[in-house]
Each structure stands twice: as C-alpha cells, then as structure tokens.
Amino acid sequence: MRPLFDREGMHALDLVLRARPLLAFDFDGTLAPLVERPDDARVPVEVSRSLDRLARLRPVAVVTGRSVADVSGRLGFSPRFIVGNHGAEDPGRSAQLDASCLDGLRAHVAARRAELDAAGVQVEDKGFSLTLHHRVAHDQDRALACIRSLLAGLDPRLRPFGGKFVVNVVAAGAPDKGDAVASLVQRAGCGVAVFVGDDVNDEAVFVRALPNWLTVRVGSDDPDSRAGFFLSDHSEVAALLNVMLGVLRTV
C-alpha cells in the first residue's frame, strides 16, 4: 500500500474521479469511528454533510457488515445504495439469500448464552449473519476460546471469518463485499469504482478490484492488505471526502 495523500495517490484519485466512478464506503471504522459499543456508532456530522454533497454528484454506496435496517439511521444522509451483512443483504437484488442455515447456530447460541455472557462475548443477530463481538471482554483469550468452542463442528453450510474484535458467520454461499461492489458498479452504470474500507471483510473488494478502480484502506497496520492506497487513520476520511468534492465539482 502507498499513502493516498502523496503526489502519486492524489494523481490516481484525480484520474479515477474524472472517470465518473461509483463511490463505495464501509461503515464501521471508515465512515464512522470504531466505538466500544456498536450501538453508539454514528457518522460524524462533518462527514455526513460531505457525503450528502457527494451523493448529489456521483452514485454513493455504503457496503457494511451491519444490517441495512441498522445502518440506515446512523448515516445522516441517503446513499443511492446500501448493502448490508458483508454483502449478503442487498435490497436491490432480485432474489434474496436464504439464510435459514443460520438457525442451528442460533439455537446453539441460545443454549450457551450464560457461558458467552460470562466470557464477555456479545452476540448480534443481523438476520443474514451472526456476529460474535469480544471487544469489551476483560479476558480476550477466554473470549476467543469460548467463540472457538461455540463454532467447533460448525455446519458446513456456514462460513466464519474474522474482523476487528469480532467473528462473523454467514451462509457459505453468501455474496461478499467484493461481489456487492462489482454488482453495484454495473447497476450504477459506472465503469470504475472508488472503495474505502478498513477491515478483514473489505479485503474481498481490494483483492478483486479491477486495475482501473481505486481502493483505499483506513490504517496502515496490515502490511498484507491488497488495497492500493491507505489513509493513516479515520481522521483522514473527512479530508478525503473534501478532496473528492473539489475534483468532482470541476468534472
């Protein structure tokens, strides 16, 4: 990854914006800062105002691990597209995913609720996925051991994957964020995309991005990330949006 805010990065951003791209963003850790309690997450006012202005110039998408219903009220603006549950929940898709294969895991969670609570593991059921949060656990080793035990012998129809202090579980055949962004590019009638994300599930976009896309990771802490560029931290997201506005107003 290379820093976005240098000469090469700014040149790449200018080129892709002049190609009239889809602008796609993750939510937690990207548009909204990471917080201890997931329910407290909101897009800062300065960021939401910039996004609202961008949405009048280009199609904007939010592609998040949260459910569509959950994230919609946290944005402060109306994007053209919202895709939730790591790509599995797309209201614009003609056929919705059958997530009934999660029911067995739901029953397993209910049976072990006391053990999970004692270990500091919070379970979030988002319909198309389950998320096991362990950010607030006092003993991280104990929390992770509890999660591993819960998922031992997991139904092969399910797929677990990690994130920042979370383990997510979706249907094995569920679309991921890479599938979602590729679909949105086509539906928006765009030839290119800008995608900004910060977590493990955003790598699905970074890995499969076409050469003319611009991919940006928030944070440079993962040397193996396949993003093309990086921002130092969440505080630089607002600056990026302002640069985008400046360029798009001249196109």
Please name every model-derived segment.
Residues 83-107, 161-190:
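Substrate-recognition "cap/lid" segment bordering the active-site pocket of phosphatases
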